[in-house]
Amino acid sequence: MENKDALDIGKDDTNTSEADVSKNETQEQPVLSKSALKRLKRQQEWDAGREKRAEMRREKKRLRKEERKRKIEAGEVVKSQKKRIRLGKVVPSSIRIVLDCAFDDLMNDKEINSLCQQVTRCHSANRTALHPVELFATNFGGRLKTRQDFVLKGQQNNWKRYNPTTKSYLEEFESQKEKLVYLSADSDNTITELDEDKIYIIGAIVDKNRYKNLCQNKASEQGIKTAKLPIDEYIKITDRKILTVNQVFEILSLWLEYRDWEKAFMEVIPKRKGILLKSDESFDVSEDTRSQSNQSDSELEKEN
C-alpha cells in the first residue's frame, strides 16, 4: 500500500508539473486580438509587395524621363541647366535686352506656357551672369502675364533687373529709337560684337517657325535696325534647329562674359543637334552632308 501510494503521489506530481509548464508556455505567447491580427496581416502584405512597388516606381521614373525628353526635343519645355560658376567678379553691363511680348494672339495656350518658361530662363541666366543686363519685357500682358502670375505666384515681382511693362519698346525707349536693334535670323546684317550703347530686341514668340519673317518685317516697317547672330560664321548645324528665346538671350549673355561667339554657341546649343565647328582644322563634310547643312542653315531661326 505504501508503495502504491508513493507511486500515485509521484504520478500526481508529474501531472501537476506538466500542467504548470503548459500554462507557463501559454502565458509566454499571449493571444492576439482581432485588430492586432488585421494589422499584422496588412504589414505582412505590405512587406510582401515591397519589391513590386519599387519596380513600379522605377517604371514611372523611366516613363517620366522619356516624356520629358520628348517634350524638350519638341520644344514644349526648356531643359533645366546646371548652376553655372561665375569666373570673376560680377560687373553689370550697360546693354539693355528687350523681350518683345507683343505676339500673344499668335500663339496657342501650349505655346504661351512654353514662352512663360523661357522668360523665366532668361531671368535665371541673367541672375547668374558675370555681366548681367537690364532685361525688359515690353507689351507684357494678356495670357502670358496670366500664366506667369499663376506659375510664379508673384515671385517675379522681386526679380532684379527685370522690367515688365505694358508699353511697347517704341514707347519705352521713345527718345532712343536709333539705339534699337531687332534680332532676326532673316536680317541681312550680322553682329560681330555687342555694343554697350545698344538696346537689343528678341521676339518673344513660340511659333515653330509658322510666321516667316515676322520680326524682320515688323522692325522694317517701324524703321528699326535689324541684325542676326553670327552663327554661320562659326558653326555648321547639320540638323534643323530653332533657337528658343532664352537660348538667344543666353548666347548674348555668354558673349559678354567670353567675348567669344564660338564658345557661347557651343555652350548653349545642344551638341546632339549635329554641330560642326568651322574653326576645327579637320572640318570636312561630304556633298550630301554639305547640302543638308546648307538646307538647315536656311531653316535656322529663333522662335520668332
UniProtKB/Swiss-Prot annotation:
Changing R121E: Completely abolishes interaction with tRNA. Changing K153E: Completely abolishes interaction with tRNA. The active site is at D207. Keywords: Cytoplasm, Methyltransferase, Nucleus, Phosphoprotein, S-adenosyl-L-methionine, Transferase, tRNA processing. Residues 1-26, 42-72 have a biased composition (Basic and acidic residues). The keyword Phosphoprotein applies. GO terms for molecular function: tRNA (guanosine(9)-N1)-methyltransferase activity; tRNA binding. GO terms for cellular component: cytoplasm; nucleolus; nucleus. The modification Phosphoserine is found at S296. Residues 1-72, 282-304 are annotated as: Disordered. Changing K110E: Completely abolishes interaction with tRNA. Changing Q118A: Completely abolishes catalytic activity. S-adenosyl-L-methionine binds at L183, G203, D207, K208, N209, R210, Y211, C215, L229, K241, I242, L243. S-adenosyl-L-methionine-dependent guanine N(1)-methyltransferase that catalyzes the formation of N(1)-methylguanine at position 9 (m1G9) in cytoplasmic tRNA. PANTHER family: TRNA (GUANINE-9-) METHYLTRANSFERASE, TRNA METHYLTRANSFERASE 10 HOMOLOG A. This is tRNA (guanine(9)-N1)-methyltransferase. It comes from Schizosaccharomyces pombe (strain 972 / ATCC 24843) (Fission yeast). The gene is trm10.
